[in-house]
């Protein structure tokens, strides 16, 4: 492998022996900046280790759904089917490349090892831990695109020094790991506690919509966490 993660093979040539690259570089330009924060990194490692815990028999993603009187019940958003074999990856091993030579690097990614491509019942999972900043415009645009192709995107907001908050948490009971979230993206639609949140207007530009989400959806969640 060379520095671009490409396979190189020797070419026998009596005059100028050399190596030939097979294929193109795996990744181009990264979209978005990484969180340079110990709390963020510790939380990513914590979630990753628990998801890969061999004692875990099942994984569930859930959310609190609130009634008008603020009582709530916990509802499951997604749980892999029994015939699934989910593998979990983080950071460099969770990269997703796009055709215009760019890529994003989710904190954690998961997929069913038995499927070549994600399906509605077997989606790919993206978990973004948010401590110091939320996804930038270009990154969010890619996450939105992916959510339309059987990817679930879960936003996990935390405060400094913590691995959970009032918005989300991880719990394990009887071999079942439950990751509770409040904010997530599925099927091109943002959700907050089970309810659709501010769908993009028919004539609204993506930039205007994202700016609104910056000042409401993401900022409010970071403040609450």
Where in this protein do the model-derived segments appear?
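Nuclease-adjacent, charged terminal/linker segments that flank catalytic cores
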Residues: 1-78, 82
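A short, polar/proline- and glycine-enriched secondary-structure boundary/capping micro-motif
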Residues: 32, 138, 166-167
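Generic surface-pattern signal
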Residues: 48, 52, 56, 148, ...
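Active-site metal-binding core of divalent-cation-utilizing nuclease and nuclease-like domains
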Residues: 58-123
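Basic, amphipathic alpha-helical patches used to engage nucleic acids or provide basic targeting signals
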Residues: 119-163
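Non-catalytic C-terminal interaction segments of nucleic acid-processing enzymes
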Residues: 133, 151-225
